[in-house]
Amino acid sequence: MACCLSEEAKEQKRINQEIEKQLRRDKRDARRELKLLLLGTGESGKSTFIKQMRIIHGSGYSEEDRKGFEKIVYQNIFSAIQTLIAAMETLSLEYKDPSNNEHAEFLNSIDADSADIFEDGHVTAIKGCWTDPGMQECYDRRREYQLTDSAKYYLDDVERIHEPGYIPTLQDILRVRVPTTGIIEYPFDLYSIIFRMVDVGGQRSERRKWIHCFENVTSIMFLVALSEYDQVLVESDNEENRMEESKALFRTIITYPWFQNSSVILFLNKKDLLEEKIMTSHLADYFPDYDGPKCDYEAAREFMMDSYMDLNEDKEKMLYYHYTCATDTENIRFVFAAVKDTILQLNLKEYNLV
């Protein structure tokens, strides 16, 4: 009997050892996954960044994938022109060519959210309105209302998009705007390590969904739209400055106890739009603390970078930053290579990389 028990005990011990070995393996494998949380206010460029990761480190977009964006491109175009038509009225601007009043009426009759065709009449009406000096003045005053960044890109290109057999290009896909609701994860494999990038909705109503994303975050990647310094928040009733809202969110994020051990990387995004806008919209008009020269892109972006970095009260916590243009694949390829090296360097031991 003792012999029998001994054999049973040995077998139980062997099973326990196997279980412990598997648990150690699972723990090690879990440590070889890096969770990167993309945060920032609405329209800061998070979804575009995810698309770039798919292009640079994933499977990209096949022709079939690209065809799937066709209707969304049409909807973005109709939405942009309707926003401009509404703003013409709000700003009491008139079309220089009276025939564009009829074009505007026709375009307003389209349901932008469900549009699935793009016909000759649409192109004629859009080109008429968009090239009208009255609407161009309206576009120049876009900080006074909410217009997507991609509006000009699409409206300048309606003839190409209307061509027979049109298939959206990668740039069309990067520019397309679909508000993120809920949480989107995009995992990709680099050097046998899984980078799991998590994009959450940036609008205020979406932020309550973030909470369960906060466990085991390797890095916070916080996106800032540099071009928003003179814009107000679409969700705000009191014309709150969009950059101030972004800074308030950033301050909250970097002080969360969940992120004590997470590195923080700041992406100062939309640098191309800032470079264009700073020539006519002066930073000091919106941020009186700015005492640098007017129309100076370098001075403006440095001031904004400092204003975010100064929010970090924990001087032990390192913040990293990069200036980015999320629609520029080569820029993101270069920046993410540096980010990846930083993250791996910070986690060498924990992720069994040494």
UniProtKB/Swiss-Prot annotation:
Lipid attachment in record (S-palmitoyl cysteine): 3-4
Binding residue positions for GTP: 40-47, 174-180, 199-203, 269-272, 326
Residue ranges annotated for the G-alpha domain, each copy included: 32-354
Lineage: Eukaryota, Metazoa, Spiralia, Lophotrochozoa, Mollusca
Protein name as catalogued: Guanine nucleotide-binding protein G(q) subunit alpha
Subunit structure: G proteins are composed of 3 units; alpha, beta and gamma. The alpha chain contains the guanine nucleotide binding site.
Location of the region described as G2 motif in the Swiss-Prot/TrEMBL record: 172-180
Biological processes annotated in GO: adenylate cyclase-modulating G protein-coupled receptor signaling pathway
CDD domains with a match to the protein in the record: G-alpha
